[in-house]
Structures are given as structure tokens and as C-alpha cells.
Amino acid sequence: MRGVRGRLAAFAAAGGVHLGALLTRRRGVERATKPVLMPLLAEYVLVRGGPRLLALALLLGAVGDVLLQCEGEAAFLAGMGAFAAGHGCYLALFARQPKKNACRLAVPYGAVWALSVAALWPGLPSQLRLPVALYSLLLTAMAAGAAGAGPRAAAGGALFLLSDGLIAGGLAGWPQARVPQFWVMVTYLAAQLLLVEGLLARPEGNGAGRVPGPVPGEAGQSWTAARASTMP
């Protein structure tokens, strides 16, 4: 149990340092801490015995985080592609959940997507309009799937929508809060953690693709083997 808590504490500590660096504008600390955030959360998933697909979703988020630190449109699109692949992993995980409210959820989330794209479209650079619309459709589908997987996952999906909506608003030239990247990151980190906890809390989220062996009492002994087992 201490091993599990230690992994979660490491993620929380790194997240706190990163957010503090954003607020104090310590660019070097910000850039150094961002790439380690999702790998730390993926490690927590693995020592909890969670699905490898969930760890992969987080590692794809780490790739996106790194790419979005780079300058240029190509890096931005590649980062968006990495996050899109991560959302695909989440969708595959949510597909294992009971689908009691799937149709009812599709309507409001579809409306949110359509209204958001319509509002953002005029302000977006022309070359980013279609990629942003397609990415946001996948993100909205992920959030809708999360909404059917319990309150924590639902909150995580909603916060992911908010976080990426803040980024899209910046691209479209909308007014930004002070230190906008802080709000992007605090909602993003909370979103990923809530999605993880929501999926780990459900038996369906710990089925196929689970890393064999580790349980909370043995977690501290199993990270090396678990990490190796997730490599392609």
C-alpha cells in the first residue's frame, strides 16, 4: 500500500511543482516537470494492477505534452494526434463498461461539440479548423463514454473538455485568464487523475489488458516487471 501511495504522492508532488512553476514563470522548471507527469501517473496505474491500455493512454498524453512544448504547427498537430490516440485508448476502455445511458448521453455531448466548433470556427486559423473539429469530436466522444462510467470518470471527461477548450479558445483569439497555461494544466491534471481513479474503481476497467501480479501490498516490488510488460 505504501508503494501505491508513494507513486500517487510523486505524481501530486510533480504536479504541484509544475503548477507552481507556471504561476511563478519559471520556464526551465515548467519544461523539465511537464514530461514526467503522465509517466508518473501511468506508473501508479501499473502498481495498482490497472489495465495496460490505461497506462498507454497516459503515456500517449506524455508524448503530446512534450510535442506541445515545441514550436510550430507541425509539432502542435503531432501533439494533438498523440492525445487523439490516447482518447482512442480511453474509448476502448469505456467500451467495456455497461452502456445504460449511451444514447441519452450522445445527444447532449453531441450538442456541446457542435456548439463549441461553431463558436470557435471563425477565429481558428484556417489550416487548423478541420483538425481541431475532428480532434474535438473524438475528445467529446471520450467524455461521453466517461460520463457513463461513474461520477469520477464523468468529472474527468468534463475537465478534459474544459482544458482543451481553453487551448482552443486561445487559438481562436478569445480573451484569456491570467496565466492561461496554469488553468489548462490544472484542469488537465485533475482530468487525467479522475479518469484513472474512475476506471480503476470499476471491475470492468481492470479486466482485459491488466498487468498480472501486482496488488497493493506487493506494488513496490513489481514496477520494473510491470513496465517491461507494457512495452510494444
Region locations from a protein language model:
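Polytopic alpha-helical membrane-helix bundles and their juxtamembrane interface segments
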Residues: 1-232
